[in-house]
Swiss-Prot record:
Belongs to the staphylococcal/streptococcal toxin family. Staphylococcal enterotoxins cause the intoxication staphylococcal food poisoning syndrome. The illness is characterized by high fever, hypotension, diarrhea, shock, and in some cases death. It comes from Staphylococcus aureus. Disulfide bonds join C116-C133. The keyword Disulfide bond applies. Keywords: Disulfide bond, Enterotoxin, Secreted, Signal, Superantigen, Toxin, Virulence. The keyword Disulfide bond applies. It is found in: Secreted. Residues 1-25 form the signal peptide. Pfam families: Stap_Strp_tox_C (PF02876), Stap_Strp_toxin (PF01123). One of its GO terms (molecular function) is toxin activity. This is Enterotoxin type G. InterPro entries: Enterotoxin (IPR008992), Staph/Strept_toxin_CS (IPR006126), Staph_tox_OB (IPR006173), SuperAg_toxin_C (IPR016091), Superantigen_bac (IPR013307), Toxin_b-grasp_Staph/Strep (IPR006123), Toxin_bac (IPR006177).
Length: 258
């Protein structure tokens, strides 16, 4: 009887863990659920705004510690980017910010706004702002982050696997933001994912699958209502600072031409 009870408990636990994996797997979108480039253009949207985000150099920093905070859910770092000398990253909540506060981190992110940080010496919010702002993009600095890791991105166009390309990262644990940026950067440069006046494609999404089969995806194109384009509304997907294992993450891109 005791053995039977043990078997039943094991079976229940297996079902629970199976269901946990199932719940954590975001279902793939249907074609009609994806944002359409033609809808965005018809609403007077300019895809060049998105193109600029993923072709401009990202913010990068290695082994840095935040110098201060403005709000409890952000961290400000002494990183030079273009003509600025500070970068503020916003995180989903205070707990997440505290995770990285006063610790040595690596940063990789896409800026969404400039002249957005109040100078430390100016408590008056009417004074001139500086710096640039981004979401997430933090990983703990590690001496193991030395060698490049290769990640293959499989691309399916109109339901046919068409090509694959490789991106690299020197991090064992890497943010989704870094991987997403590098994939979109390559697709924009090589396959015209984003052009000033549109795209070579009508819709699409990028999908990430972790070792435990947890999966999630991002729509590659803005909603038709995002006119005029507001960068923070497009990039706030990175605010959760999602970090994955670069050795096991699977990346796929699904594109449609009509």
């Amino acid at each position: 009887m005791k053995k039977l009870s043990t078997v039943i408990i094991i079976l229940i636990l297996e079902i629970v863990f199976h269901n946990m994996n199932y719940v954590n797997a975001q279902p793939d979108p249907k074609l009609d659920e994806l944002n359409k480039v033609s809808d965005y253009k018809n609403n007077k949207g300019t895809m060049g705004n998105v193109m600029n985000l993923y072709t401009s150099p990202p913010v990068e920093g290695r082994g840095v510690i935040n110098s201060r905070q403005f709000l409890s859910h952000d961290l400000i770092f002494p990183i030079e980017y273009k003509s600025y000398n500070e970068v503020k990253t916003e995180l989903e909540n205070t707990e997440l910010a505290n995770n990285y506060k006063d610790k040595k981190v690596d940063i990789f992110g896409v800026p969404y706004f400039y002249t957005c940080i109040i100078p430390k010496s100016e408590p008056d919010i009417n004074q001139n702002f500086g710096g640039c702002c981004m979401y997430g993009g933090l990983t703990f600095n590690s001496s193991e982050n030395e060698r490049d890791k290769l990640i293959t991105v499989q691309v399916t166009i109109d339901n046919r696997q068409s090509l694959g390309f490789t991106i690299t990262t020197n991090k064992n644990m890497v943010t989704i933001q870094e991987l997403d940026y590098k994939a979109r950067h390559w697709l924009t440069k090589e396959k015209k994912l984003y052009e000033f006046d549109g795209s070579a494609f009508e819709s699409g999404y990028i999908k990430f699958t972790e070792k435990n089969n947890t999966s999630f995806w991002f729509d590659l194109f803005p909603k038709k209502e995002l006119v005029p384009f507001v960068p923070y509304k497009f990039l706030n997907i990175y605010g959760d600072n999602k970090v994955v294992d670069s050795k096991s993450i699977k990346m796929e891109v699904f594109l449609n031409t009509h």
